[in-house]
């Protein structure tokens, strides 16, 4: 297998490419930009594409995938595509319809991976972020074990090859793993993970359960105004990463991506810039030494860019626990 398409074997037997292309973009970026960027990513060698119903771009991402299949660049089975169940569809009866809606937008027959996007449940309906007249979120109370059973049915129906979770803490993972009658374990937990929040304890726990940790915001953050503290430090300007970049004649972004691959984390790289999309594929062309890895480990300072404070309150808010 050529280095570009290195994969990790999931606990259900399917394979996931260790480098993924993230398609989320801030609200002000036109959605059709996802079409061009995803095509460029596939042309550059990305085979793992990550999106979600929340991102409002699945019709464009699907169009990009289908156009690259149509022109012979890839076959459908070469692509590993991830979608995610949004919080307003946690009730078991809404899970399959939500996935079917994503598939309709994508014009695909199945997704390779379907994730519970975030463990806090929101009021069902068309509104992605339902709020009351005071601007407070409208929550729902759903047993995530029931949501998981509906996810398992989506796998059995062939609509999703694999199923997993995102933004779950250890307690929430254990709740699923210890569920009576569990049919399929989550194959992965996709979480914010980068040198400033290296998730060591969660990573060790996931490894012990044969669950893959997938890193989003691996390059720091998109720093989108409503969501991210504008005073938080910029990861890619970190002096240690910059020094290592100089040493290896690479970019700080490549150092941050390579760090994750060497600790057994699947990493998502998001860029809509053609040069950087191509650049990020070079992560397989070099290695960090154990000293380099130790230096990056030393950067961990528990900085979470995406705290999603508006979701705080319900017991399922995941970021109150240590990990």
Curated annotation (Swiss-Prot):
Q: What is its EC number?
A: 1.1.1.-, 1.1.1.112, 1.1.1.209, 1.1.1.210
Subcellular location field: Cytoplasm, Cytosol
Tell me the subunit arrangement: Monomer.
Name the principal localization, coarsely classed. cytoplasm
Protein task:
Cytosolic aldo-keto reductase that catalyzes the NADH and NADPH-dependent reduction of ketosteroids to hydroxysteroids. Most probably acts as a reductase in vivo since the oxidase activity measured in vitro is inhibited by physiological concentrations of NADPH. Displays a broad positional specificity acting on positions 3, 17 and 20 of steroids and regulates the metabolism of hormones like estrogens and androgens. May also reduce conjugated steroids such as 5alpha-dihydrotestosterone sulfate. Displays affinity for bile acids.
Instruction: List the pathway annotation.
Output: Steroid metabolism
* Keyword NADP part of the UniProt annotation: yes
Residue positions binding substrate = 24, 117, 222, 227
From the UniProt record, which GO molecular function terms apply? 17-alpha,20-alpha-dihydroxypregn-4-en-3-one dehydrogenase [NAD(P)+] activity; 3-beta-hydroxy-5-beta-steroid dehydrogenase (NADP+) activity; 5-alpha-androstane-3-beta,17-beta-diol dehydrogenase (NADP+) activity; androstan-3-alpha,17-beta-diol dehydrogenase (NAD+) activity; androsterone dehydrogenase (B-specific) activity; bile acid binding; carboxylic acid binding; estradiol 17-beta-dehydrogenase [NAD(P)+] activity
For this record, an example GO cellular component is: cytosol
The active site lies at 55 (proton donor)
Annotated site residue numbers, Lowers pKa of active site Tyr: 84
Disulfide bond entries? none
- Keyword terms, alphabetized: Cytoplasm, Lipid metabolism, NADP, Oxidoreductase
Activity regulation, in the record's words, is: Potently inhibited by benzbromarone and 3',3'',5',5''-tetrabromophenolphthalein (TBPP).
Instruction: Enumerate the catalysed reactions.
Output: a 3alpha-hydroxysteroid + NADP(+) = a 3-oxosteroid + NADPH + H(+); a 3alpha-hydroxysteroid + NAD(+) = a 3-oxosteroid + NADH + H(+); (17R,20S)-17,20-dihydroxypregn-4-en-3-one + NADP(+) = 17alpha-hydroxyprogesterone + NADPH + H(+); (17R,20S)-17,20-dihydroxypregn-4-en-3-one + NAD(+) = 17alpha-hydroxyprogesterone + NADH + H(+)
Q: Which residues does the UniProt site feature Important for substrate specificity point to? A: 54
| Homology family | Belongs to the aldo/keto reductase family.
Which InterPro entries does the annotation name? Answer: AKR, AKR1C, Aldo/ket_reductase_CS, NADP_OxRdtase_dom, NADP_OxRdtase_dom_sf
**Name of the protein in its database record:** Aldo-keto reductase family 1 member C1
**Positions annotated to bind NADP(+):** 20-24, 50, 166-167, 190, 216-222, 270-280
